[in-house]
Amino acid sequence: MATIKSIKARQIFDSRGNPTVEVDVHISNGVFARAAVPSGASTGIYEALELRDGGSDYLGKGVSKAVNNVNSIIGPALVGKDPTDQTGLDNFMVHQLDGTQNEWGWCKEKLGANAILAVSLAVCKAGAAVRNVPLYKHIADLAGNKKLVLPVPAFNVINGGSHAGNKLAMQEFMILPVGAANFKEAMKMGCEVYHHLKAVIKKKYGQDATNVGDEGGFAPNIQENKEGLELLKTAIEKAGYTGKVVIGMDVAASEFYGKDKSYDLNFKEESNDGSQKISGDQLKDLYKSFVSEYPIVSIEDPFDQDDWETYAKLTAEIGEQVQIVGDDLLVTNPKRVAKAIAEKTCNALLLKVNQIGSVTESIEAVKMSKKAGWGVMTSHRSGETEDTFIADLAVGLSTGQIKTGAPCRSERLAKYNQLLRIEEELGSEAVYAGASFRKPVEPY
């Protein structure tokens, strides 16, 4: 049996110039695997702990403690173990080596979710190589998923919120090519709409409005969220894809939710007089007006991460026609997912491996979501690396959807390009989620 020979971590940099953790795993039979973890800007308060150094170096964002935890604690403890035993290794790291818990489960406060996840991802890649199967196939086998599906890409083409220096409150305006025949065609549609959008924005707001945000989307200095939707609608029309390319939003509403329980759509304005503060119910009605006017199929984080009540109201009212996605609400945490299923809070999971901190717990959250009839969208973070693990994850778990930025910036394209390779490798077996993106496969 091939066993883990050595595990080594180092500090590298993400796409925002912040330190992050990378791990190398060497196996006794000569197999080598490497993985790096991403980092978010608009983070949910219930995410597992991302261990940072504090102090003045790297403005407090160094990860030498997390790196040291891998090199001195996790790595030595995993030497001699079987890299194909993902569940066993993840549980050993999370339950025994770390062991910290809070009301929502294993919180990784001792070793850091960034340390544990980097090892979890690298071990998963090594396990696939030891079994001599592609990573997506290994992940599918770990989850018990028999049918592989290529996801619909959700391209974040207009950036606002915490991802951009404009006044737009809502964070992401996305396009989803649901009418494409395959992933390759979906990329073509997405790229063409993106280029048309650039031309539309340049003509209306000038050259500097086509500067891009952290995820490669444009960040024109508009304030009206509806204007973002209007720009998308126009670009889709100009590209000739009306009806084939639809719209998704990530509002990231926790970013503009105040202590007075209001939502401030003008939260980025320094001389803010509070005139754009609205209640949860008013915001809910605003979404309903958007949905009636534009081809919106997905709304993520429409309310604050603790506003379960308004979430449930929106889901009850428009959940049939639009998926309501929990990101900050759920933080890929199986306990929070279970609560949301029971309370009918939302009807889709945003899958971010670094919110929970291990491959095994991520698979658990996805399986629960699918059994409840939910949609699942695999996601990058705004601070990314060139690592492509989530592309294989989306196919292996048949999530049906992936968002990993605009078709711009190499750390975003790395994932989309990997999906093109996977589709090519699957050949005639390749299935594209398309219009079935909310339920691409039966629960497994």
From Swiss-Prot:
Coiled-coil ranges per UniProt: none
Catalytic reactions of this protein: (2R)-2-phosphoglycerate = phosphoenolpyruvate + H2O
Top EC group: lyase
Subunit structure: Homodimer.
Binding site for Mg(2+): D250, E300, D327
Protein name: Enolase
UniProt subcellular location: Cytoplasm
Similarity annotation: Belongs to the enolase family.
Pathways per UniProt: Carbohydrate degradation; glycolysis; pyruvate from D-glyceraldehyde 3-phosphate: step 4/5
Cited Pfam families: Enolase_C (PF00113), Enolase_N (PF03952)
EC number: 4.2.1.11
Chain sites annotated for binding substrate: H163, E172, E300, D327, S379, H380, R381, S382, K403
SUPFAM superfamilies tied to this protein: Enolase C-terminal domain-like, Enolase N-terminal domain-like
GO annotations of cellular component type: phosphopyruvate hydratase complex
Cofactor: binding comment: Mg(2+) is required for catalysis and for stabilizing the dimer.
Gene3D superfamilies: Enolase-like C-terminal domain, Enolase-like, N-terminal domain
GO MF term list: magnesium ion binding; phosphopyruvate hydratase activity
Keyword Flavoprotein annotated: no
Statement: the UniProt record of this protein carries the keyword Magnesium: yes
Organism expressing this protein natively: Solanum lycopersicum
Necessary cofactors: Mg(2+)
GO biological process: glycolytic process
Keyword entries, A-Z: Cytoplasm, Glycolysis, Lyase, Magnesium, Metal-binding
Active-site residues (renumbered): E215 (proton donor), K352 (proton acceptor)
InterPro entries: Enolase (IPR000941), Enolase-like_C_sf (IPR036849), Enolase-like_N (IPR029017), Enolase_C (IPR020810), Enolase_CS (IPR020809), Enolase_N (IPR020811)
